[in-house]
């Protein structure tokens, strides 16, 4: 029945999704501030069309929130569905094979910024709700909360949740913003890493200076920054900030056995991103490195002359954006201060260092014995034909731990992305097969949840 419904309504569904994608709701870029409001308003319209009884765009300290609800019985359980309508910047545009904000279907995939993260996945939730609502299959209440700042760390959502605790009161939270290991390896995410993110600025002379007149006589800020970053890890991939690992727990033998049982194709993994060799902390497998271990990365670095031809200068300033993915028990605020203090302490006196903490969030672990998890597990199994693996994956959704702290409920991470979907990258996409299966699996979740 659900397959037939999707087939008969897919053209309309895609038109609705594409109306969201065409709004360039890039939260990181101030120029797109009006687009955030436009996208929120469009989501409100789509939720009403899907069957909620109430939907509104609500103000926050930042970009607007979208709230919707379908209350079938005040004494029944309530599922809160969370998603985000903001997307990552699409740059570099020249690497896209089609316009990032003009969705295109080719080779069985939807190609666009937000096709997966998270417009596509949130839309899966909305269409699954549409089916159960319009067919009078719901026995529990459903609420939606969609934010517009997830890609910049959800700075406004915590205060919004605190202010609207009663409105958002629920028994469990359902999120589609994660990935499966493969379409033939159904997966439910049971853990997320936390994150801490900084921008570092290294200043030398008070202006860009002639590299012949000053080269060898003063410190070059770019050289210094590169050395500071290089010295933060060793050749075995271990992070060298003192105290960084103090609260990191080793994975249990059972957890390591579970990860080892996941059939990850390492050659295919390398081929998909065109690298010849993998690298990471010595003594751990690839899935252990991304699931159970913290990491340190440079997300951007710039300074000096980068135009055509040559310009012989020593730059006044050099910059980098840095991030650490964290594991449960590592506090992002503590790590934020620890890393900031480290760089200021070890920097040579020949330069000035300013480091700003931009955003962060805690990690999260979902207990796999909770009834709602079992409903999700069954919902996925009914569609994909096999029981989904329980796996901790390397990404971060900082607000998940905040939901638990304020609302006191757990979150089920029921994602339908794939690594090949290239989220945060040029040519982001979503297979139509996963779009369809996702809707069907979430419908099954709701039906199974009602049996609890």
Which residues does each PLM region occupy?
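Polar, glycine-rich mid-to-C-terminal structural blocks
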Residues: 205-208, 212, 217-269
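N-terminal helical capping/dimerization or prosegment-like subdomains
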Residues: 1-93, 317, 334
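Acidic, glycine-rich active-site loops and adjacent beta-strand->loop/helix elements
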Residues: 85-87, 145-153, 176-180, 204-206, ...
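Acidic/histidine-rich catalytic neighborhood of metal-dependent amide-processing enzymes
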Residues: 116-191
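Flexible glycine/proline-rich, aromatic-decorated loop/lid segments
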Residues: 187-203, 412-414
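An extended, acidic, His-containing surface patch that forms the Zn2+-binding/catalytic region
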Residues: 88, 182-183, 240-317, 328-338, ...
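Active-site metal-coordination/substrate-binding segment of hydrolases
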Residues: 76-143, 437
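Generic non-transmembrane alpha-helical segments
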Residues: 5, 12, 16-19, 23, ...
């Amino acid at each position: 029945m659900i397959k037939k419904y999707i087939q008969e309504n897919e053209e309309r569904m895609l038109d609705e999704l594409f109306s969201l994608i065409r709004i360039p709701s890039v939260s990181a870029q101030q120029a797109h501030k009006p687009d955030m409001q436009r996208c929120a308003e469009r989501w409100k319209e789509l939720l009403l069309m899907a069957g909620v009884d109430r939907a509104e765009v609500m103000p926050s300290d930042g970009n607007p929130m979208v709230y919707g609800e379908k209350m079938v019985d005040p004494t029944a359980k309530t599922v809160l569905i969370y998603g985000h309508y903001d997307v990552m910047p699409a740059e570099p545009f020249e690497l896209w094979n089609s316009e990032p904000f003009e969705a295109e279907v080719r080779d069985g995939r939807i190609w666009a910024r937000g096709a997966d993260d998270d417009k596509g996945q949130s839309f899966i939730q909305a269409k699954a709700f549409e089916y159960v609502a319009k067919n009078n299959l719901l026995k529990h209440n459903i609420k939606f909360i969609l934010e517009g700042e997830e890609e910049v760390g959800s700075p406004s959502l915590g205060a919004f949740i605190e202010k609207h605790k009663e409105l958002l009161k629920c028994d469990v939270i359902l999120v589609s913003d994660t990935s499966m290991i493969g379409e033939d390896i159904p997966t439910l995410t049971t853990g997320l890493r936390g994150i801490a993110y900084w921008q570092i600025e290294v200043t030398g002379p008070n202006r860009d200076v002639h590299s012949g007149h000053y080269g060898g006589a003063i410190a070059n800020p770019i050289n210094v920054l590169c050395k500071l970053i290089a010295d933060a890890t060793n050749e075995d991939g271990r992070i060298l900030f003192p105290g960084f690992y103090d609260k990191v727990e080793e994975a249990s033998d059972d957890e390591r056995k579970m990860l080892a049982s996941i059939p990850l194709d390492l050659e295919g993994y390398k081929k998909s991103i065109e690298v010849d060799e993998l690298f990471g902390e010595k003594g751990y497998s690839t899935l252990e490195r991304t699931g159970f271990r913290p990491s340190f990365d440079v997300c951007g670095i710039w300074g000096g002359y980068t135009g055509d031809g040559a310009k012989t200068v020593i730059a006044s300033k050099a910059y980098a954006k840095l991030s650490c993915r964290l594991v449960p028990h590592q506090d992002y605020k503590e790590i934020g201060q620890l890393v900031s203090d480290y760089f200021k302490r070890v920097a040579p006196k020949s330069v000035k260092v300013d480091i700003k903490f931009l955003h962060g969030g805690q990690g999260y672990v979902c207990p796999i014995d909770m009834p709602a998890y079992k409903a999700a597990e069954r919902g996925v199994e009914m569609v994909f034909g096999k029981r989904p693996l329980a796996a901790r994956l390397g990404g971060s959704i900082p607000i998940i731990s905040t939901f638990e702290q304020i609302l006191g409920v757990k979150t089920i991470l029921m994602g339908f992305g794939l690594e090949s979907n290239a989220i945060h990258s040029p040519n982001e996409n979503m297979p139509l097969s996963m779009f369809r299966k996702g809707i069907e699996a979430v419908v099954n979740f709701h039906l199974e949840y009602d049996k609890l």
